[in-house]
Amino acid sequence: YSSAASDVYKRQLSVLASYPEFGCTGGPYEVCPDWGVFPDVLCIGNEQAMQFVEDILGELIEIFPSRYIHIGGDEAPRVRWKNCPKCQKRIAEEGLRAGGGFTAEDRLQSYCMQRAERFLNARGRSIIGWDEILNGDVAPNATVMSWQGSAGGIKAAQMGHDVIMAPNTHCYFDFYQTADTKDEPLAIGGCLPVSKVYELEPTAGLTEEQAKHVLGAQANLWTEYIATTEHVEYMPVSYTHLTLPTNSLV
């Protein structure tokens, strides 16, 4: 598949630094020079912020011909939404209620994802989201990319959603390739030897009919700890010289 990517409401500190009115607290905000998960995200109760999201998505589809737009959905803290009068008003107006193991703020995320999906579907595009978009009321036409193991992908396929398997248990190539790391360049952690990559079965746990929803698998090489091209080439080198089965990684 081909996709363009956008985090529509989290990791937005750069946006909030420029447009503090789009945040729940009003700022001031600073651009973060590092990586991580931060509490300040877009205010979903602010209609101008939601229009900003749609404007960005509109620009993306003008630039990229991709059928799919990956809009994120992972690692979005709820703390600001929980304490934000505008977000709480949106929750009340939309009838978003806690239940089924999910909070009203979880369903506020679902509202945002569904709104983005409607915007893109109306323009002939489809969304992909990380498996956290299952936490609430998943957008009805969304393709789910499962990174927290395979459980989210299995659940999504059982629900009738298309799935891309990218489990960190098998497909995160920024992990160390060996348990003996003393001579290895810095990595984020973990241990993912080639043998573990080969063990990936993207359709395990699914019926033949459910397995049809698995579009394939994706390996990720995140670069928080990878500063040079040489390091990029080193990290997956043990994998990329192998011919992996086409039913495992695509």
Name each model feature, range by range.
Residues R11-Q12, P20, F38-D40, P140-A142, ...:
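Generic structural motif recognizing short loop/turn segments at the entrances and edges of beta-strands
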Residues Y1-A5, Y9, H241, T246-V250:
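Single conserved hydrophobic/aromatic residue that forms the stacking wall/gate
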Residues S3-E21, D162-I164:
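Glycine-rich, aromatic-flanked loop segments that form ligand/cofactor-binding clefts
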